[in-house]
């Protein structure tokens, strides 16, 4: 069985996507470079002040974290992977093992801002689901059931793998591998989608038309995103492609499923890591980062739905390939 398709279509699409993907790559590279400038620089060493405990994360760092989280959370490029990359450049990262654990927890908790943004954008769908729970909206009930089914695999597997993933996969090499592999998967899924649209196929499904098997399949696809650099959004959108959802509907199901999954992940991480976070991070920067994440996520979500309807995933394939190559070079040259 051939798992990796020919890369010839990538070469054909190069003229279409190269300029856009390279511009996005340069933009995020600019954020990475400037993130260090946004952080508070320590002054000259002063023996008298070393004994005074200072906040572990500055407001400048919080803004950078929030912006990167909001922009990348719902794009198929891995927000966690980007946040880990950014955190490696932050001064607060080099303040001991406990601070590193606090930052790793904050990288998950900051998703609360992005969650709120999507909840506001899809408030009608959420209201329909609520009415469905009350037995007043059959359409909303079917959608809610599908989302719960898709959430179950991550809910059952996630808590058991959380510590193992953080200890083994929160690094440059695992992120680079996941970015590269994800690019190949997206290219294959997009090529398959185009062939299906050009040929004879069954009508594409609506969100309410998903059955138990399709919803569960998307849920298991989401579990692969526990590996940083993979992207929860990418795996669920690709899963939607494979069960017959059109591009925009696959993205919308990914966003709605993300509301449940990200809320659970942020809540779980907040409860289990609250002590280390509260003792190392001030509330001001934490809340500021969440607000920035919410504002940038709102723009990102609206843009992505429109873009996918017109262009598909091609630009993100190129972005992930370029970024993975850069990270590989950084890792093996250090």
Predicted regions and their residues:
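Multi-pass membrane proteins that catalyze or facilitate reactions on polyprenyl-/lipid-phosphate substrates
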Residues: 2-334
